[in-house]
Amino acid sequence: LGGGMGISYSDKNKKFNYKKYSSAIVKFIRKHKVKIIFEPGRSIIGDTGTLVAKIIYIKDSGSKKFIILDAAMNDLMRPALYGAFHKTLAVIKSNKISKKPYEFVGPICESTDKFITLKKFQELKEKDLIAICDVGAYGMSLSSNYNLRPKSVELLIKGSKIKVIRKRQKHKDLI
């Protein structure tokens, strides 16, 4: 079984009820005497990853602002691939709210190089850091070198210890 044990990608979604789910599975196993194999995927590692991106440019289009990040669809394919939602936060909090909606996009010239559009978000400026949450499942495993973009560094953080578990690629690594 897989696909049913997701994670909550927004504050609006309810947390998965493992007790209710396991109770139904146990009942089914006892009745039908079958073996069930689980693929829990996202429920185990989905919330263990965060993509941190820097704002490289802000483009005001009149009705909204495009927040262009140094991360792109090659770093996190889920929004481009199937419109997946990932909670997005400013790393440094501010109480000033933008008067215009923000569309968070990557620097690749593709219409699908888009992470999220938010109607209400704090004021941002170039070089601010943005955290795109819950990318532990299918974040790095779906990443690619599309458009000759090097893959980003991957860090493991445990308490106050930080360890590089994958070095940032360089363009020479791609050739």
Where do the PLM segments sit?
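Charged (often Lys/Glu-rich) extended helix/loop segments that serve as interaction or gating elements
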Residues: 24, 33-175
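Extended, folded domain segments that form the structural surfaces/walls around functional sites
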Residues: 7-36
